[in-house]
From Swiss-Prot:
Family statement drawn from the similarity comment of this UniProt entry: Belongs to the HAM1 NTPase family.
Binding-site list for substrate: S8, K9, N10, Q11, G12, K13, S68, F146, G147, Y148, D149, K169, H174, R175
SUPFAM superfamilies: ITPase-like
One GO process term, biological-process aspect: purine nucleoside triphosphate catabolic process
Entry's EC annotation: 3.6.1.66
GO molecular function, one term: ITP diphosphatase activity
Function summary: Pyrophosphatase that catalyzes the hydrolysis of nucleoside triphosphates to their monophosphate derivatives, with a high preference for the non-canonical purine nucleotides XTP (xanthosine triphosphate), dITP (deoxyinosine triphosphate) and ITP. Seems to function as a house-cleaning enzyme that removes non-canonical purine nucleotides from the nucleotide pool, thus preventing their incorporation into DNA/RNA and avoiding chromosomal lesions.
GO annotations of cellular component type: cytosol
UniProt keyword annotations, A-Z: Hydrolase, Magnesium, Metal-binding, Nucleotide metabolism, Nucleotide-binding
Cofactor requirements of the protein: Mg(2+)
The protein's assembly and partners: Homodimer.
The protein's name in its UniProt record: dITP/XTP pyrophosphatase
Length: 191
């Protein structure tokens, strides 16, 4: 079975990927701990390509990466590409966003995900982008998910990502939508 390395050290992310790529005949693995990739691109796309390219080079295998984040209208798109570095942990990131939006009526936001797959030769062979629109609520709701999931209410369901079951989240999340776009290509590669 061919290996596909997820260019991430985030255990929550690999669990999400395993569910979404269930029908792809590959062994999905987290990147080795020894690999460090600096996310210094100025776009989500640049960061996704850089991560997949570096991990494919160092593992000599296929690699998949995404760069994703939340962009909040009233904060001029922040945290944006700095979403995972906006504070030291999920709880503090949520607290910071809620503090910065205190008293703000415009709470519109969107999650964005850029997904990239690189071949063992580091060539970009698949990529996609998807967004999910919603609002930042006043206080966290729900027990599931990770990151900003408890404060992001998806527009069509009126549920936070933390309140959604996997089926609902996979169908409407930014990452789920971006991955679905490249699944036909992955099925071909890993057939």
């Amino acid at each position: 079975m061919k290996k596909l390395y997820l260019a991430s050290k985030n255990q929550g992310k690999i669990e999400e990927y395993k569910k979404l790529l269930l029908n792809v005949n590959c062994q999905l693995l987290l990147q080795p701990e020894s690999i460090e990739v600096e996310e210094n691109g100025i776009t989500f796309r640049e960061n996704a390509i850089k991560k997949a390219s570096e991990v494919s080079k160092k593992t000599r295998n296929y690699a998949i990466a995404d760069d994703s984040g939340i962009c909040i209208d009233a904060l001029d798109g922040r945290p944006g590409i700095y979403s995972s570095r906006y504070a030291e942990n999920d709880q503090k990131r949520i607290e910071r966003v809620l503090h910065e939006l205190d008293g703000e009526k415009n709470r519109g936001a969107f999650f964005i995900a850029n997904v990239c797959v690189c071949s063992p030769s580091r060539d970009v062979i698949l990529e996609s982008e998807a967004k999910c629109f919603g609002n930042i609520i006043l206080s966290p709701r729900g027990k599931g998910g990770f990151g900003y999931d408890p404060i992001f209410e998806e527009r069509s369901t009126r549920l936070t990502f933390a309140e959604m079951n996997n089926v609902i989240k996979d169908s409407c999340s930014h990452r789920g939508r971006a991955l679905k776009k490249i699944i036909p290509g992955l099925l071909e590669i890993f057939s």
